Amino acid sequence: MLYELRVYDLVYDNRFGMHDKFENYTVPIFKKHGFRVLGFWETMIGANYPQLTYILQWKDLAERQQKFTAFFSDPEWLEACRIMDPKGPFIEKIHSSIMFPTKYSPMQ
């Protein structure tokens, strides 16, 4: 298994719009395409506040590529972007790391 850590540095004045987009559009479309989301977190204290962090689980890189390709071409996602994006940018920067567990990790 592989794990993807995704951290979004959010635009402060538009951070609630990002949460709305995830709750109402992103998460349902993730479910539709079989994304395995291990959790979502919002930074409470930290140098890059506000941030949205989440972890995805993948069998391999091919699965990641296939599911993200389907996600980004999904008509529901394209409509969500059309509706939400004119409200202004939500994200300043995206950090993404693909990780695999160490042999001593409980996440095997």
Residue ranges and their predicted role:
Residues 9, 55-57:
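Short hydrophobic/aromatic beta-strand micro-patches
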Residues 47-53:
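The conserved glycine-aromatic submotif of the RRM
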Residues 16-38, 59-97:
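An amphipathic, aromatic/His-enriched active-site/gating alpha helix that lines ligand/cofactor pockets
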Residues 12:
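Active-site acidic-Proline motif in GNAT/NAT acetyltransferases
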Residues 1-5, 9, 41, 46-47, ...:
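Intrinsic disorder/low-complexity detector
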